[in-house]
A protein has these predicted regions:
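C-terminal non-catalytic alpha-helical accessory regions
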Residues: 1-222
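Conserved small/polar residues in nucleotide/adenosyl-binding loops
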Residues: 226-231
């Protein structure tokens, strides 16, 4: 193990893991809502700057194509980006309240960029990709009807959970981010930017209905439009 990796794990243990565990996920995987950031699931008690430094040190390590190390890089990196997304989203909500159109647009674009980066990062390992999850589910069926049945259940498990526990089993996976989470966030972002630009209030019921429509449509689909890019 190289020295940068040793330093990274030491810092992770002393500065991050030593804290009282509380975070269960990152905000991109939860349904968007104004001034509501799933605090019990996404808040943390450590500095994201410290975690960013851990990620930087891991990236300084000599090229290592082992699966375990690649997973470490992805896991730490997506937490860094997820924490950053939370910060930008909180600023976005403040700009909604302040009616600052230009600042709101800038925050919205930054949020979309982070979601895109998260999707690309996770694509560097098949265990962090939606296409493997869907493919494995469809392999359980021995007819087109059964394949579709198992795919629907696989989609349901990681998203709406039948409507009773929405986002309970959220996953930061390539494909799921771009094809599902990002679609919801784009509606949220664009809706508030448009409303502030026009000087009107957002119809919260209509927004929620649009988000639910995206969720239900995705769960009931049987066509995976996403293809993971090949790692370089």
């Amino acid at each position: 193990m190289s020295q940068p990796v040793r330093d990274a794990w030491k810092r992770l243990f002393n500065d991050i893991y030593a804290q009282v565990p509380r975070t269960l996920g990152t905000l991109p995987g939860y349904r968007p809502a104004l001034n509501k950031n799933s605090e019990k699931r996404t808040s943390n008690v450590y500095s994201n700057v410290e975690l960013l430094e851990v990620w930087r040190k891991l990236n300084e390590a000599p090229s290592d194509r082992r699966d375990a190390f690649r997973l470490d890089l992805i896991t730490v990196g997506r937490q860094v980006l997820g924490n950053y997304f939370l910060d930008v989203k909180m600023e976005f909500d403040r700009m909604v309240e302040a009616k600052d159109y230009q600042a709101l647009k800038a925050c919205g674009e930054k949020m979309k960029e982070i979601l895109n980066d998260l999707d690309k990062l996770n694509a560097f390992h098949p265990y962090c990709s939606l296409d493997k999850w869907i493919d494995d589910a469809r392999k359980m069926g021995d007819s087109p009807q059964l394949k579709d049945y198992y795919e629907k259940n696989a989609r349901n498990l990681i998203t709406t959970w039948g409507g009773s526990l929405n986002d309970y089993a959220s996953r930061s996976w390539a494909g799921l981010i771009s094809d599902y989470y990002a679609k919801r966030w784009e509606v949220y972002i664009d809706t508030f930017i448009k409303a502030v630009g026009e000087g009107v209030e957002v119809d919260q019921k209509q927004l929620e209905d649009e988000l639910k429509e995206i969720e239900e449509g995705w769960v009931n689909a049987t066509c995976l439009l996403y293809t993971s890019p090949s790692p370089r």
